[in-house]
Amino acid sequence: MLLRTLLWGSIVMTAATLQAADADTRVYEMRTYWAAEGKLDALNARFRDHTTKLFEKHGMTNIGYWVPLENPDRKLIYFLAYPSREAREKSFKDFLTDPQWQKAQRESEVNGKLVDKVESRFLQVTDYSPAVKPAKKGERIFELRTYTTTPGNLGALNDRFRNHTLKLFEKHGMTNVAYWNLMPGQEGADNTLVYILAHASKEEADKSFAAFRSDPDWVAARKASEEKAGGSLTVPEGVKSVFMRATDDSPIQ
């Protein structure tokens, strides 16, 4: 009996160790660039020909690069990953002082700067996110969704996604790509969920969401979670959606 107990304890500890080893503890960064008027193509070309390679040279992992399907603001949205915030700071410092980058930047900006504005947010994957890794699966579109929760309800929202929403998305033909919360110390860190889905097309996305919203399992899960929280888990207009296409050099396509 004692031997059996010890063996069982060893198995449990081994499983826990493996689970911890598999946990993605990387720091993610979501970067949004607003290209200067008429410069989005040149910006994408600079990333394709120079920037992504130099990021990798300096220890940064390219996760994915996207542009919105409707893009009047000329946005480029991309994600990087690093072992830590300290590693991120060192990598960017080395990148910015790399003569190859300085030459590429100088030559690409002969006729003016390519970027008007940059926004950065640091993220950590949720414990229910699929593994974030390169994937090229043919023609498809992506959807970046950002949720802002009512006060104190980010945990409840994560619980609902973990226990119900992801499975129902897959049931209705949507692909879960990645899920993140903001890292502490940033505005919105206690109330923001950011995630990416993939769809066969915009039309298929609309069909999938219509079927999802009318699914009795979703209706029940939503009702139960909102009754427990005493109301909606998200603020009014707290769900933002951007449909995107991957750039031709994006590791996730």
PLM region spans:
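Bacterial N-terminal signal peptides
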Residues: 4-15
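Short S/T/G/P-rich N-terminal loop/turn motif that feeds into the first structured element of a domain
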Residues: 19-253
